[in-house]
UniProtKB/Swiss-Prot annotation:
Protein name, as recorded: Chaperonin GroEL 1
Gene name of the encoded protein: groEL1
Enzyme class, spelled out: isomerase
GO cellular-component term (any): cytoplasm
Lineage: Bacteria, Bacillati, Actinomycetota, Actinomycetes, Micromonosporales
InterPro entries: Chaperonin_Cpn60_CS, Cpn60/GroEL, Cpn60/GroEL/TCP-1, GroEL-like_apical_dom_sf, GROEL-like_equatorial_sf, TCP-1-like_intermed_sf
Role played: Together with its co-chaperonin GroES, plays an essential role in assisting protein folding. The GroEL-GroES system forms a nano-cage that allows encapsulation of the non-native substrate proteins and provides a physical environment optimized to promote and accelerate protein folding.
Entry's family note: Belongs to the chaperonin (HSP60) family.
């Protein structure tokens, strides 16, 4: 395919136009008075959302250079969402502000590499100040406030705080759709580990990229499975029962994997295969934990158990399993409560005996998985469109609350960035274009607060100047239009969200500024369809 190449200013301006189109669509959603965006779907009803990353994903531009610019900013939103579950719109606003200021300086003759160094130094300094500003989450109310702001709904914040209180910060919180109206919290014993399906063909829900099975059998094997001959006896027994199967093994490959995939695709037999978590002795121990939790046995030749001789009573059971590309959750295993408690006590004893911090940390993780459990938030709504949007917001709010527990909380509403900037730049000793790079960051830090004010119908510049002049920790409550002590009013953000948004935005901005050429696919001109044959002269 032929390529188009643009250089210098033409290349950068093309990227900027694409970035601006995407950022302008996303930034209207920022803050409590942010608007919604309607996304057309090829099938079904349109989606209404105020989630930055969902909007960004939908935007596809026609111009090749603009398309690349938009894709780069999508990466900012996606990366921030992956790390912290929120802050996608903030990251987009920051990236747009940095690129706009940066390109102005590059056009005026500044050295892009020096600007990049200045931006990186300034961002590191501001990130450090943000972590100093952060206060540890001490109360259930603070978790509720953080999650409420992310979801835009106080009732969501309360239910997430309740869930975290019950399962602890090590526990797992999942969100499910419900047929009833409103929100429900269901606490279930369960376990999650960091291994996903071996093949994407095992998915049952392509939209969420998950394999979800109710009431499955769970086969736990401490070896590789490559021959289908070894698997057949137990597969036949499970197929007769009509239940799905989760296989956890060191690896599944060759004809064994091919057989499972073919049967799954044809709809003959539902199954999903995942690799066992951990390595070496730790893997053995974790497989043992899963076996006790599900009431099964670890099939291992070390203890004289062969795969072709497995009976149904050696296979574990659970109420539900959810497998994504990265992790597996086993909900409500059918294991004996006494045996599970015995295993928990054994791990606690090992923690007390261990003198290695690393071993102790890994044992603590195993303990949390066995004893922590899973909280399920069931969400219902009047329409399918509202249900999807609400569920997505709650999932983001859960990640947001976990981020708050991890690195602490800072004043919300874009104020933390403005106030961290007040002290961060005093320590920097930069000259020339590097100092200009730092100045670009300083100007960009006002962006989120300015946009929140604009979305609330206020004058952005006036609000930013007012916040700079008032007491630290105080800022705009955009919902009421007043200036308050943000922490006391529960207007807070996780430090991790704010820090990730800034770091990801600066990373992409630096790439924009140092771009000297863009190579894009040349759009193909589709030839017009040939004219059809004439109808001829016909008499009737």
């Amino acid at each position: 395919m032929a390529k188009m190449i643009a250089f210098d200013e033409e290349a950068r301006r093309g990227l900027e136009r694409g970035m601006n189109q995407l950022a302008d669509a996303v930034k209207v959603t920022l803050g409590p008075k942010g608007r919604n965006v309607v996304l057309e779907k090829k099938w079904g009803a349109p989606t209404i959302t105020n989630d930055g990353v969902s909007i960004a994903k939908e935007i596809e531009l026609e111009d090749p250079y603009e398309k690349i610019g938009a894709e780069l900013v999508k990466e900012v939103a996606k990366k921030t969402d992956d790390v912290a579950g929120d802050g996608t719109t903030t990251a987009t606003v920051l990236a747009q502000a940095m690129v706009r200021e940066g390109l102005r300086n590059v056009a005026a003759g500044a050295n892009p590499m020096a600007l990049k160094r200045g931006i990186e130094t300034a961002v590191a300094s501001v990130s450090e100040e943000l972590l100093k500003l952060a206060k540890d989450v001490e109360t259930k109310e603070q978790i509720a406030s953080t999650a409420s702001i992310s979801a835009g709904d106080p009732s969501v914040g309360e239910i997430i705080a309740e869930a975290m209180d019950k399962v602890g910060k090590e526990g797992v919180i999942t969100v499910e759709e419900s047929n009833t109206f409103g929100l429900e919290l269901e606490l279930t014993e369960g376990m999650r580990f960091d291994k996903g399906y071996i093949s994407a063909y095992f998915m049952t829900d392509p939209e969420r990229m998950e394999a979800v099975f109710d009431d499955p059998y769970i086969l736990i094997v401490n070896s590789k499975i490559s021959s289908v001959k070894d698997l057949l006896p137990i597969l036949e027994k499970i197929m007769q029962s009509g239940k799905p199967l989760l296989i956890i093994a060191e690896d599944i490959e060759g004809e064994a994997l091919a057989t499972l995939v073919v049967n799954k695709v044809r709809g003959t037999f539902k199954s999903v295969a995942v690799k066992a978590p951990g390595f070496g002795d730790r893997r053995k121990a974790m497989l043992g934990d899963i076996a006790i939790l599900t009431g099964g046995q670890v099939i291992s030749e070390e203890v004289g158990l062969k795969l072709d001789a497995v009976s149904l009573d050696m296979v574990g059971r659970a109420r539900k399993v959810v497998v994504t590309k990265d992790e597996t959750t086993i909900v409500d295993g059918a294991g004996d409560a006494e045996q599970i408690q015995g295993r928990v006590n054994q791990i606690r004893a090992e923690i007390d005996k261990s003198d290695s911090d690393y071993d102790r940390e890994k044992l603590q993780e195993r303990l949390a998985k066995l004893a922590g459990g899973v909280a399920v938030i069931k969400v219902g709504a009047a329409t399918e469109v509202e249900l999807k949007e609400r569920k997505h917001r709650i999932e983001d709010a859960v990640r947001n609350a976990k981020a708050a527990v991890e690195e602490g909380i800072v004043p919300g509403g874009g104020v933390a960035l403005v106030q961290a900037g007040k002290t961060a730049f005093d320590k920097l000793d930069l000259t020339g274009d590097e100092a200009t790079g730092a100045q670009i960051v300083k100007i960009a830090l006002d962006g989120p607060l300015r946009q929140i004010a604009v979305n609330a119908g206020l004058e952005g510049g006036v609000v930013v100047e007012h916040v700079r002049g008032i007491e630290a920790g105080h800022g705009l409550n955009a919902a009421t239009g007043g200036y308050v002590d943000l922490m006391a009013a529960g207007i807070i953000d996780p430090a991790k969200v704010t820090r990730s948004a800034l770091q990801n935005a600066s990373s992409i901005a630096a790439l924009f500024l140092t771009t000297e050429a863009v190579v894009a696919d040349k759009p193909e001109k589709t030839p017009a369809a040939p004219a059809g044959p004439g109808g001829g002269e016909m008499d009737f």
